[in-house]
Amino acid sequence: MKKTIGIAACAAAALLLAACAKEGPGLFKGNYTFKTSGSVSAELSIENTDGNSSSTLDLDLETEQGQMDILKTGSGDGGMIVTMNVLGGDVRSFRARAEGSSLIVEPFDTKIKLQIARHGTATIDVTASGSAKRYGDVVIFDLVYEGEGVSEIGESTAEVKICDSSVQCIAKLND
C-alpha cells in the first residue's frame, strides 16, 4: 500500500512538473514556419498629375511567409527574441516576453507593404506590437500596426496614416 502511494505521489509530482513546463518561455521556444497577413484601415492621400484625392480605405497587407525562431534570452524574466526570415525578403527580429500562457510582443519598428488598388504597392514604416497564444503546435500572433508614411507609387505620391489594423501571424512548429 505504501509503495502504491509512493508511486502515485511520484506520478503526481511528474505531472505537476510537466504542467509547469507548459507556461512561460518553454511554451513558445522553437523553430516555426510562419505566414503573416491581414489588413489596415488607413487614411490615404494620393497626389498625382490629376490632382489630389483623399479617402479612408481598408488596405490588404502583402502576405509574408518564412521561418521563425523563438529563443529564450536567458535573463530569467521570461524574455525572448523572435527572429523572422521572410522568404525572398528581409530578416527581422524583435523582443517578446512570456507571461504564463501568453507571449507579449514588445513594440518594434518594421516596414510593411500595402496593396493600393490601381496604384500599386506602398511601403511604409510602422511600429508593431501585440500578443500571441499557443494552441498545440501553432502559435497565433495578433498584431497591432501603427504609423504613417509617404511612398512613391509610379507617378504618384501616397501619404498613408494607419487608423486601425487587423493582422495575424500564424506560426506552425517545425518537426
Question: For each of these PLM feature ranges, what is it?
Answer:
Residues 1-9:
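Bacterial N-terminal signal peptides that target proteins for export
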Residues 52-135:
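Predominantly extracellular/secreted and cell-surface proteins with exposed
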Residues 32, 104-108, 134-152:
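A short hydrophobic beta-strand element
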Residues 16-19:
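C-terminal motif of bacterial Sec signal peptides marking the signal peptidase cleavage site
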Residues 22-53:
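Tryptophan-anchored aromatic micro-motifs
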Residues 38-50, 111-123, 148-160:
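Flexible, membrane-facing loop/turn or short amphipathic-helix motifs
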Residues 37-41, 84-92, 144-152:
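Short, solvent-exposed aromatic-acidic interface loops
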Residues 140-175:
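Edge beta-strand at a domain terminus
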